[in-house]
């Protein structure tokens, strides 16, 4: 059984890594997980190339849920999705959810075998 992968995208590499660390400690290693954040010199920012690489690292035939912090992360995630092969695009979604809580609940759902739509819906239920 394929498990939905999770990608965490933050402008801060420390935030992205910290959120990923929380996910790992709470759900273990079975959920495909990748994170990316910051610019090439460690400054704040995001890169659609790095996001594309993270999607590939977390890839699962069950799909990939992306959690982002701010607008630029979402825009670059959308660009990264558009750069994927056509057959993969429909299996990658951006969740409108708080990055830390959303990543944890999305990974928890994924670890239980939930499909991509359920993972996304559950994460987005955390939004105000």
Predicted stretch roles:
Residues 1-128:
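N-terminal loops that bind phosphate or other acidic moieties
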